[in-house]
UniProtKB/Swiss-Prot annotation:
<comment type="similarity">
    <text>Belongs to the bacterial ribosomal protein bL28 family.</text>
</comment>
<dbReference type="InterPro" id="IPR001383">
    <property type="entry name" value="Ribosomal_bL28_bact-type"/>
</dbReference>
<keyword id="KW-0687">Ribonucleoprotein</keyword>
<dbReference type="InterPro" id="IPR034704">
    <property type="entry name" value="Ribosomal_bL28/bL31-like_sf"/>
</dbReference>
<dbReference type="GO" id="GO:0022625">
    <property type="term" value="C:cytosolic large ribosomal subunit"/>
</dbReference>
<dbReference type="GO" id="GO:0003735">
    <property type="term" value="F:structural constituent of ribosome"/>
</dbReference>
<dbReference type="InterPro" id="IPR037147">
    <property type="entry name" value="Ribosomal_bL28_sf"/>
</dbReference>
<dbReference type="InterPro" id="IPR026569">
    <property type="entry name" value="Ribosomal_bL28"/>
</dbReference>
<dbReference type="GO" id="GO:0006412">
    <property type="term" value="P:translation"/>
</dbReference>
<feature type="region of interest" description="Disordered">
    <location>
        <begin position="1"/>
        <end position="21"/>
    </location>
</feature>
<dbReference type="Pfam" id="PF00830">
    <property type="entry name" value="Ribosomal_L28"/>
</dbReference>
<protein>
    <recommendedName>
        <fullName>Large ribosomal subunit protein bL28</fullName>
    </recommendedName>
</protein>
<keyword id="KW-0689">Ribosomal protein</keyword>
Length: 78
């Protein structure tokens, strides 16, 4: 399973670990992904999504129905 948010599309970024001596080594910054179930009242069922913490805030603000409609319009959800 890819480390990508299904709502926002956020994925891993690359950067550097920087030591006190300013030595740099490559590293990955992973998104804060959570597997969450959301109750969809209009469909009377649970929907399981792998979402970032920001996506949970977006769902709280706009509602799960609006977010699912956007996902279906983009063709990312059946």
């Amino acid at each position: 399973m890819a480390r990508v948010c299904q709502v926002t599309g956020k994925g891993p970024m690359t950067g550097n670990n920087v030591s006190h001596a300013n030595n740099k080594t490559k590293r990955r910054f992973l998104p804060n992904l959570q597997s969450r179930r959301f109750w969809v009242e209009s469909e009377n069922r649970w929907v399981r999504l792998r979402v970032s913490a920001k996506a949970i805030r977006i769902i709280d603000k706009n509602g799960i129905d609006a977010v699912l409609a956007d996902l279906r319009a983009r063709g990312e959800l059946a």
